[in-house]
Amino acid sequence: MDAIAEALARLRTGDTLAATGIDPADPVGTEVRSAGIGFRAVTADGRVAGLEERWHAALRELRECIRPIGDAGLVLHEGGVYHGAWLESTATIGAEVLGRFAPAVTRATHLALAAGQREDGLLPYKITADGPAFTQIQMVTPLARCVWDHYLRTGRDRNYLRTMADAMARNDAWLAAHRDTRGTGGVEAFCTFDTGHDLSPRFWGVPERCHRGDAARFDPGIPGLPFVAPDLTANVVSQREHLALIAAELGDDPEPWLRSAARARDALFAHCHDPRSGMFYDRAADGRPVRVDSDVLLRVLACDIGDDALFVAALEDHLMHTRRFLSAAGFTSIALDDPRFDGDHTRNSWAGPVNALTMLRAPHAFEAHGRVAELALAHAGLLQAMAGHDRFAQCFDPWTGDAGYTEVYSPAILWLLDTLERDAGILPRAGGEVWLSGLIPSRLGEGQAVAASAAARTVGGVHYELAGDDERVDVHRDGRLWLRFPRGWRVILDAGGAPASVVCLAAGPVAGDLVVAGAAPLALSLAPNARADVRGGRLAGIADPGFTPPRS
């Protein structure tokens, strides 16, 4: 039995819930089982690979992060030392990824946040057993995008969409009334925690919380406040653009949202963008930029900001540059060549270490511009490190990937689950596409390479199994071999389940045949990021956006 056959056999005979200790009658267990989710990986000598053990640990600890809050039922908690669900992460990017595993919990988390809204329209920055909290706004990932994604994935529940749309519209009105005191059209930061950038030199000398615990006030005795904040402003741009989509879906007029999004976008580039460096900086009240090179750049790009040219420049000058943000374990929170960089990963810090949230948010930026090979290359070091970890931490050592601050941290847990589906698994998309990704983790270092891995998921009533080694990938559909292609490709199925495109995820060219049962093989040679469109089993064209290798 070769390694692929062994991994596939383990996948078929294994029990995901038994391996994770989740009760099949548990609500989360029921959703995982109904989705047919599984993952197995074997080493060259037939042992269970570290990645398989960590995958099962991730599901088990994810369940620990799902608990009731008040009358809201089961909701996602941030985990570790962070109690409750947080707007910047748990209820947004965390809940978005969770929606592929436990969609009912995603819905409940969103609705719990909306239920905690204050009478004046402000959404809580977190909800805990003690109730909603309002001492800062703490926004990063746009909630409206996550709501829209969940709506499309789960049967288009218009009551859910209307509830969330009304809550988000009221929150937007609160922000417009209280967080644009300078009339720029942007969104202002009044304190460190508004952006969740704890310990970042971006906010040296700035209070952690808003003045006297009031999110509508800043301390007038602090020079420079308020800052026009690029990440907060970018959040609102994307938020309003998605509120326009939601308005159109609900029969409302989307144009006011589009106009307000355009005004915020103009403010972002007028006040926060430095065209010479390509970075985005806070603009202090005296007009000076706060020149701290931080992951604000990636936060902005992950909010659907910028065209392909701007993103390529960001890759070349910053994100894929080893003197800037590309470390051995992923993207740092402060540029490595900034003299204020501090890589201490043993504390809650955005002053340098790699943060799980940065890595979890990154795919939105890269995939919007077709730069999937750079994304896979950038996170390979953390995947390798995490295969040997004993806990799911918030912060990681940029040099080694060692786990640092806290444990049972849901963003790290969800990052591993997301990355293995994104690289070497079956990932259903909100628009109906299914990604079958074959970048099998067979080339990891530190003894963590697998001989083969196998993943399973049921999508639209069809059960897919994807198994591969260092050479090839086999995809079974409802138990029968259906597709075969070389390691390093992603085959994209359209909403009808037919192969529509092939994308190269690998950092080098990959040539081979796309073999579909009952059809003639299609020979392809693809450079990194190249996308071949397939129609009726024939090549319809290839688009090649280019590739940016690591720079120094």
Predicted regions and their residues:
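Catalytic cores of carbohydrate-active enzymes
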Residues: 3-12, 42, 46-54, 176-191, ...
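Beta-rich accessory regions
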Residues: 275, 367, 371-374, 439-552
